[in-house]
Every structure is written in C-alpha cells, then in structure tokens.
Amino acid sequence: MAQGQQPIFILPQDTSRYVGREAQRINILAGKVLAETVRTTLGPKGMDKMLVDSLGDIVITNDGVTILREMDISHPAAKMLVEVAKTQEDEVGDGTTTAVIIAGELLKEAEKLIEMGVHPTIIALGYRNAALKAQEILEEISMEASDRDTLMKVAITAMTGKGSERAKEKLAELVVDAVMQVEEDGEIDKDNINIQRIQGASVNESRIVNGIVIDKSRADTSMPKRIEKARIALLKYPIEVKDLETDAKIRLTDPSQMQAFIEQEEQMIRDMVEKIKSSGANVVFCQKGIDDLALHYLSREGIMALKRVKKSDIKRIEKATGARLVTNIDDLTAEDLGEAGVIYEKKIFDEVLTFIEECRDPKAISIILRGSTKHVAEEMERALEDAIGVVASTLEDREVVAGGGAPEVEIARKLREYADTISGREQLAVSAFADALEIVPKTLAENAGLDSIDVLVDLRAAHEESPYMGIDVFDGNIVDMKEAGVIEPQRVKKQAIQSAAEAAEMILRIDDMIAARGFDVSSKDEEDMEGMGGMGGMPPMM
C-alpha cells in the first residue's frame, strides 16, 4: 500500500478471521476434541457420560448421538461432526460413535500430511477415492442375512454394553418380533414401533403389545373403561361447535333468542354424536378437542372417547386397526372404522395408558419397556431404539458384516494394498485413510483395558488368514466374530465410513473462516479446548 493511503476495510469492525493453515488447524483441532469426547463410550466395555443441563436435569448414557445432542456445541467444524452422528442415527440407528471417531481420526491423519507439505486438496481427493474403495471391500466381506437367528445376533450385538446386559436376549426377542411384524413389502418404518417407557419394575417385565399403547386416558371418567370387540373411529374434526372464523357479532334482542341459540348449539353437538353412533363406532380417537356436552352424550351411549390424541399415535392406530382418519364428521361411515379385540385403560406405575389389543395383523405395534428407575429406563430405550434400527436395516438389506473391529482391519489391510497401486502424494492420503480406520479396534481394546498396540498387531496377523477376525473385549482374545455371533448390518459400517470421509473432506477444504462479531474467544482458551473446555466457541481469528 502506497504511503499515505488509508487501509480499506471490507468486513465489519470486530469481525474475526483465520486464513490458510491456521483455519485448517483450528477446524482439525475441533474435530479431534469432539472425537476424543465420545471415544471412551465405544464398544461393550465403553464408559458412560453424565450430562447435566442448566436446569439440573441429568442424562446418563454412552450413546454417541445423545451425548452430542445434549452438549452445547457451537464451534462450526464440531457442529459438522454432530451432523454426521445425527445422519447416522436417522439412516441406520446405530454406529454414531464409530462415525464420529473415524471422522476425527481422518482429520488427525490429515494434519500429519499437511505438516509434511501435502496439499489439503490432494488429501481430500485421496480420502474420496479411499472411501469408494472401502465400500467395494465392504461388499466383498459382507455375509448374507436371511434368518431370524441372524436378526437376533444383530440385535444383541447392538445392545451389548448399553445398560441392557441383564435382559438383552429378552429385549432382542421383542425387537425382532416387532420389526418383523411391521415389515411391509420389504420395508420397515421405524415410526410404526412405539416404545412406551415406564419405570418402577425390572426390565424383564417388558413386553410386546399386539396393537398400540397410547399415553392417554378416557376423556371422561363416566365412559366405559373397557370395550370388547371395539369399532374404532379416528377423527381429525373437533366434536364441538366451531368458533366463528370472522369478527362478526351476533346481536340478540330478547332472552328467547339466547335460548334458541343455545339449543341450536346443543342440537349440533347431539347430531355429531348421533353420527358417530350410527356409524357403529364404540370407541373414538379425536385429534382435536371434544366439548363437555359431547362427552356427556358419548358417555350415555356407552362410547369410549379420547381427545387431543397425537398425530403420530393416530397414524399408528390407522396401521394397527385398519381405521381411516376422517376429516369431516359428516363423512364418517362404517367403512372408515377400524377393529380391535379389546380396548381398555390401565394404570402402570404412575402412568395411565390406553391399550388397543388383539388387532388383526397390525402393521404398527407398541413395546412396553420397564426399568427400575427413570435413568435406567431412558438408557434402555436408547438401546432398544438402536436395536430396532439395526434389525430393520438388516431385514431390508439382507447384508451383515462381522463386528469387533474386523471390517475396519480388513478394509485397512486392503486399502494399503490399493495404495501401492497409486502413484504420487495421493498414495499417502489413501494410506492415512487406512490408518484412520484402525482407530475402531484400537479404541475397543483401550476401552477394555487391553494394550491397543499388541491387539492391533495380532489382528493384522489374523487377517492374513480370515477377514472375520475381531477382538473379544471380554477375554482379550482374537476370535472369529462370525462364529462368535458378533455381527452388525453392512449399512452401519457403510454409512459411518461414507459420512466420516465426506465430513473430513469438507472440513479439509476450508481455508478461510470469518466469524461474526461476538463469536470469538481469547487465544488462551485454545489450551482449554484440548481438554474439552472452549468447545462452545472458536479460537480467535487474527
């Protein structure tokens, strides 16, 4: 700049900025810290985290996505890895911790290459090619899953180490039965399996319901508490007189007009109840409100009614009973009604529930999940949701892989062979990708109190003979995971590797960060960030 010229500012005052290597270093640091946070939770011997929010509410879990969701993370690069975990949870239901620690390790390996002088673009290209090759290798080592026994093994593997050890076989039975029941044309909608979590009893008292359970009671205590041979009407229409949609006013000039007006309203409600009765319905689930007078008339007709039922519950009742949701009560006919053998209200512990049972081939069902305390029941529910996700994935794809770190070691071994066929610096990136994948067996060993280096060396040697060799964290031996029954859906590994690679690639391609005013911390916080302080913000952009 020539002498005497004024500097030109193109960004608002107090905006912070990092450029080039500094931006990459900060983002990689954030990714590594986040991965280290959840790393200790991986595997059957993984530890739990206690998360306490500003209100003092406690969550105790080793579920990766739950930990990341509950943490107050605002660092942009760390948020990208949280999205990886959420995507993994939505797509598969398990493997969230695996996805995050692989992404963190990919960034760690990339940092070494950047320090060696390898350009981030070359690393990103190498990672992309390595991820594609990893998917091919995964297909080669996958096994076909076609029977109930395989589904049981998948469910048990998913729940091992998640607080459900004492009853994992029983819970696996419930999960497999539930998923197989709701399957339609080879597809499973996990929303059709409803888990009702109730504390106050042993997990062994959990059971599956051949129908739906909703956490609602009768709209009026004078209504029947139990209905046999239920004929079910589902209404989106409120059973009450609608308010005027305009600001129009009704002017009454004498008391008789007021009386006529009231009588007219009552007649409209009587007509609605009569419409329900004439359709043959003896149970009504209404998504909207029900007028007190309507409740009186329904009760007098011996009809059970529940009001303000959640939309998700209405959908499940449709799937379970064959009922059709009616948006206008005048259109309600006998053809719209669903059927159930019995509907009854029951109080369990401190919750009043309505059971819709003995449904004919229901495509939506409920699981009553018990737990001795609130926190135990919550962790059981997370384990059950993971198991439902992996069993559904297995049933849809019919492809599984061995567990215990076996797929990662085998993919890493073959990626190194693939790297030898590539020339240039991209070869280093593919080799780094292979090294990063071995973080999974290393972490499994560390969390079990074993020597990770010895375990990894033994695993590599064992994989010269078989691709199914993995680590048995309970006795520390290298065993055939296929024979041991430790198996996972192929989709879990596929999604984890793909998501981790894409997230790492995206972070590596960032060479400029501009933070708005107020989104900044002092440089001394960078040391805190290494120990998980400072994850709420970004180090300064000089």
Curated annotation (Swiss-Prot):
PROSITE patterns, per the entry: TCP1_1, TCP1_2, TCP1_3
Keywords in alphabetical order: ATP-binding, Chaperone, Nucleotide-binding
Highest taxon of the lineage: Archaea
Molecular function GO labels: ATP binding; ATP hydrolysis activity; ATP-dependent protein folding chaperone; unfolded protein binding
Gene3D superfamilies, alphabetized: GroEL (3.50.7.10), GroEL-like equatorial domain (1.10.560.10), TCP-1-like chaperonin intermediate domain (3.30.260.10)
CDD domains, sorted: cpn60 (cd03343)
Family recorded in the similarity comment: Belongs to the TCP-1 chaperonin family.
Subunit structure: Forms a Heterooligomeric complex of two stacked eight-membered rings.
The protein's role, per its UniProt record: Molecular chaperone; binds unfolded polypeptides in vitro, and has a weak ATPase activity.
Name of the featured protein: Thermosome subunit alpha
Species of origin: Methanothermobacter thermautotrophicus (strain ATCC 29096 / DSM 1053 / JCM 10044 / NBRC 100330 / Delta H)
Gene: thsA
